[in-house]
Amino acid sequence: MINVMYKNSCPNCGGDISADRLLNGLPCETCLPYINGIDGIDHISKVKALYNILLDNDKIKNYWNLYYNITTFETVFKYFKDKTGYEPWSLQKLWLRRLVSNQSFTMSAPTGLGKTTTLMTYSVFIGQDVVYIVPTKSLMEQVCKRLEKLGAQVSCGKVDQRKVSVITISYLNKNADSITSYKPNFVAIDDADAVIKSGKTTDRLVSLLGIPNDVYESAIQLIRLRNKYYFSNEFTEEIKEKIRELELKIAEFKDKISQLVIASATIRPKGIKQKALRLLTGFEPSSIQLYARNIIDTYTDNLDLSIIKELGSGGLILVSKEYGRSRLNEIKKYVEDLGFNAKLAISGRKFLDDFSQGKVDILVGSASYYGVAVRGIDEPKRLKYVIYYGVPKIKAKLFDALSNPFTLLRVGKMIGVNFSELQNKILVLSPSEAQLLKFSIIKGETINYQKLEQLRQELLYYISLVKDKLKEIGEETLISDNFVIAKQNTNYYIIYPDMITYLQGSGRASRLYNGGLTLGFSIILVDDKHIFEILKKKMQKLFPNTNFTSLSNINLSEIKTKLEESRKEEGNRVHFNISTGLLIVESPTKAKTIAKMFSRPSVRVINKVPVYETIIVDGNQIYVLDVVASKGHIVDLTLEDIGYYGIKIEYSGIIKPYYDLIKKCLDCNKTFSIASDKCPYCGSTNVQTAQTTINLLRELALSVDKVFIASDPDTEGEKIAYDLASFLSPYNSNIYRITYHEITKKAILEALRNPMKINTNLVMSQIVRRIEDRWIGFTLSNLLKTKFNGHNHGAGRVQTPVLGWIVDKTIKYKSAMGYVVYIDIAGYPIKMHFSERKKMEEYINNLQVVKIEKIFEEKILLSPLPPFTTDTLLIEANMKYKLPANLVMKIAQDLFEAGLITYHRTDSTHISSVGIEIAKEYLQKQGLIKDFVPRSWESSEEGAHEAIRPTRAIDVNELIQEIEENPYKYSIRFSKLHFLIYDLIFRRFMASQMSHAVGTKSRYLIKLNKNDNINAELLSNAEGGFIKVYPVKVYNLPLGEVKPKVNTGKGSSEQLLSYSDVISLMKSKGIGRPSTYAKTIENLVRHGYIVSSKRKSYLIATNRGISAYQFLSSKFYDLVSEGTTAKLMSKLDDIALSKLSASTVLLEIFSEISTLVNPLKSEQNV
């Protein structure tokens, strides 16, 4: 039996505790030796029961904090119910938990979900030292009345620290000096846009929050330093130290400011003061999230507004911005002439009050994202339909827009400017580099960073080329898939559809009412067919079920009835189940990718860890999720002196591996797992600990309904999930494991629909592998260090046989050194080896011409290769591009985390029905559907891995086009190699789903001289089928006498091993796994045992490596031979399948090591 132990991790006393206890939500045995009667009770009751038992036994310590939080939550929930008359629902509970935990954050939910009610109830709960800020005086009066109704002592229109003070932004700005000494406990902002837009208002808010001016100025200085020096040649150690000082000063003060909660915002902070506030509060005001749409989207190809006569009262007309204010007035008059009361919705709130009271039938406003008509109307009962007078558009002067490198690239390619040299430089820009280039071009400033300054000069040159080309084109309107370029008067404009304004504006007609979403009706009066088609395409990408129907196909009478029915008290509305959760992934990139995939997430930074809040909609189920990265493993086997290298083996046969939190030294970048805040390698105290992540995850887990652990779908990922579940179980009992093999919306939704339990068999397999690695590695490394009197020695079961292969080939290569003649015949290489220079020279002198005869030829069928597995991808990338395995794995990891390919650690060639459909879609649009041959390649159990394939039907050119159109879509920084590897994966997969090709196999007799005849059987032609996307090498040799290309050099008759050779051997001999191919070679390089040749990436053993291997193989052959290693790998697989006992295998390994190693240790001379 294996009993996993965690060092210093008891939630009560901080002592050692077993995983079993943590998973059951219990303290350690020292705190509670015996426990009965709590099985089967809910989490809150369990916490209370355990608290009382600990208290009765005088053992209560840190568990008091958990009990306090739980009971405080209960208190505020009860208070909420007493005040409002109903239980807070899931999302309100999340907000209330955050509020009583003193967190600052944004409530990024649509109107109708109880944001204002929650904020008001919490304000009353606090009772005093509360400042509630609203944008207008009329709203202030409404809030005051509601607060008084809830029982608050209210100060309406001025600040009184003994009460709940409700004030306007205007009051804050005018009376800032009189309230400088006042620091409230809690500040609520109903609409943050006024603060975000105005630097002056930000100054006033900073003062109100109790942030000293010097700290505020430090935050501003920090942002300026980062902006100025990040890409500068002057980014010296002195500047870095100054940045560190400022960061420390801000961090020390963060917990001392007032709690700030923002109920809504529609824009993001851009000014330096607003960014400083974000830095100080730890969160960014985010736009209101779009939870779902319940809208009928329609269009008509004219600007006829007479449809109003049939739809009647309750409409909003949004006029495209280019028509100007005068057209709004004309439309208002037209509506009034039809017999309706109309009013302009341009500013203030009077128009909305009149509309709500039924005094106004139709509102007319501007189709502007920041306009009150688009974002300021919330009338679920009155507003039923929205008419867009003209397609909503964004229009900018083209020459100004060209300062954006990506816009320049797209426009230039559209009009035929050759960007081949510049394209790769632009595509690999980071967002901050692109921004810096953009602003330096606009301002005409140079960049104090040579690489970017050179690129700026190139961009200016290409801008001039684009301008000249446009002058040649003249008046013609240019249309692309994503924008239109038009000349109006003397200026060129670039025009895009304004999809966000369409979504926000049409969303005014579909609001939450009585727990459901009303039906809305949207009509676009199309004034530009090209822009409308682009809008349709973008909408369908974001909402695949979107379908714009021609108004001529709509029964308006039926629609009008449905709209009215939807607004009745018991009407037919779309209802939702909203639940809150914590989604834990391994990497920050993956967290960002998933969060961005479903919505525009809000971000809070807690203890330097970004927490993304995203909305995931799955039909009527809505998840409000905090997405956080664990950054891989949080624990590792302890380095403390416990048992045999951190593992105790008790007489009863129980094995206790002790795990400690992983810490990372930020100076030497090494990780360690001991209970010390000092790096054991370099002595630095600049150490980062996983405890920070665990504390944050516990805090977040306590606030949500469920926890979803989504670490990678392999044994390492399962162990990470097991550890996370252990640490979080005392704080939330609803913990689930979810897995996915690709980061796509469909895969994430499927995973959330099918939560699982942690697979303990996979966990045990990983534990055995890690313990075996620790025992073998530490034991042999220590012997190597003793033998060779040096550091940085290492050994392991897999590393040692691999080192042996490289050592063997290196020795043979060196012993067979001589001279080599390289002969090239029309691309076909021949290599001849000679032991002596003289013989080589004689051979060359006799080699004037080569005679070639074709002696046989036949037609053959060529079958496509299966899609890539980890080993075949590494082999192919090395053979084609000479890339080392660790670099290919890093790139594949990036592509996976960006959601572009399926999981890259796999030994399966299976392709799912989803993958087959992707191939069909791509081949269809490329006109290659006749070559489509669906293949699953191998059977696969449910949930098993797939081969490595793309997640969408876009090739590398389409991917590049996507990045040009939306450079910030993906959360990784692309390089040329990312495109190379993606292209390789994509084409190999597509080929695997295509028909056979027809090839010609030719046999040639190549006569080099009298004695050297070579029979070469070569593929001389290949065409059709999969060859169209994945060409193969062909040799079409000329016949007769040919003068060859000849080169000479020193060389060997023996071939060194390449990365691809080693990976092939690991696979064929059964000692490699998808997770170990690259790591094994990387470790051998790190220990200085092998080096890689620069030109051809051959692996060569060093003298150090040869000595280490000869010692290990002579003393421990039975421990590290490839046969023994292969058997162990097989046993690990059997443990994962529950065919073998993990503890039995570990005891065998321990016995094996003891038998071989202990006698050697006792020898005098190791």
UniProtKB/Swiss-Prot annotation:
Residues 580-743 form the Toprim domain. Pfam families: DEAD, Topoisom_bac, Toprim, zf_Rg. Residues 576-1166 are annotated as: Topoisomerase I. The active site is at Y903 (o-(5'-phospho-dna)-tyrosine intermediate). Keywords: ATP-binding, Cytoplasm, DNA-binding, Isomerase, Magnesium, Metal-binding, Nucleotide-binding, Repeat, Topoisomerase, Zinc, Zinc-finger. Inhibited by UV light-induced lesions; substrate is completely cleaved but a nicked form accumulates, suggesting the reaction is blocked between the cleavage and ligation steps. Inhibited by actinomycin D; substrate DNA remains negatively supercoiled in this case. Activity is stimulated by SSB from S.solfataricus strain P2. Positive supercoiling is inhibited by Sul7d (also called Sso7d) from S.solfataricus strain MT4; SSB from S.solfataricus strain P2 relieves this inhibition. A zinc finger (RG C-terminal-type) spans 662-689. GO terms for molecular function: ATP binding; ATP hydrolysis activity; DNA binding; DNA topoisomerase type II (double strand cut, ATP-hydrolyzing) activity; reverse gyrase activity; zinc ion binding. Its main location: cytoplasm. ATP binds at Q92, A109, P110, T111, G112, L113, G114, K115, T116. Modifies the topological state of DNA by introducing positive supercoils in an ATP-dependent process. Increases the linking number in steps of +1. In vitro requires high concentrations to supercoil negatively supercoiled DNA, relaxes plasmid DNA first; DNA single-strand binding protein (SSB) from S.solfataricus strain P2 stimulates positive supercoiling. SSB stimulates DNA-binding by reverse gyrase, and thus all subsequent steps. Binds to single-stranded DNA, transiently cleaves and then rejoins the ends, introducing a positive supercoil in the process. This enzyme is the only unique feature of hyperthermophilic bacteria/archaea known and seems to be essential for adaptation to life at high temperatures. It may play a role in stabilization of DNA at high temperatures. This is Reverse gyrase. It comes from Saccharolobus shibatae (strain ATCC 51178 / DSM 5389 / JCM 8931 / NBRC 15437 / B12) (Sulfolobus shibatae). The gene is rgy.
